[in-house]
Structure formats: C-alpha cells, structure tokens
C-alpha cells in the first residue's frame, strides 16, 4: 500500500501514511459485517478505491478550510481518502441508503 500511494503522492506525511494503512485494515473488517464495497473487490482496495479516489488530488489544491460535499458516498469514496489527503479542509459525506 505505502509504495502505491507514495508513487503518486511522495510528499504525504507519516500521519497520512498511517491513516491510509489503517483503511487497509478497517475496510476488510467492516466489509465482512456490512458489505461496504464489493466483496470481490476488497483485495484491490488501494488501487480500485483509495488511489482512484485520490486521482483528483493530483489536480486539486484546495485552500485551507474549504468545504467539500460527497453526495452518495457509498463506502466513503472518494470522501474519506480525500479527507485524509486534505486534513485542513472539511468534508461532509452523505449517503441516502443505510
């Protein structure tokens, strides 16, 4: 995981690395309980979900305290990875289905 994210985002902090690594532990655990993402895709969490969510971060430089709204967040993508990438911004994740 660490290398796949650092390949595209070499300047992320140790805290962010730890948070992304924690996602790799929490998502499979919770996916067993509530099917957060497709069970077939859980082995590709970093490539298909986390890095995919972060793709916009290569082109986005938000000002601190910018507020983002992730409508239809589903399993928390792209909101959770982007909130990790931009910790000085506010993210609101909304999902209609529970």
Model-based region annotation:
Residues 1-63:
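Class I SAM-dependent transferase core
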Residues 54-98:
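Conserved SAM/SAH cofactor-binding pocket of Class I
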């Amino acid at each position: 995981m660490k290398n796949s994210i650092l390949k595209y985002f070499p300047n992320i902090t140790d805290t962010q690395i730890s948070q992304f690594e924690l996602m790799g532990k929490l998502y499979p655990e919770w996916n067993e309980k509530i099917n957060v993402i497709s069970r077939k895709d859980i082995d590709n969490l970093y490539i298909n979900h986390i890095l995919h969510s972060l793709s916009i971060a290569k082109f986005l430089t938000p000002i601190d305290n910018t507020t983002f709204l992730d409508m239809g967040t589903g399993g928390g993508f792209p909101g959770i990875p982007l909130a990790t990438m931009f910790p000085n911004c506010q993210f609101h994740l909304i999902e209609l289905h529970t």
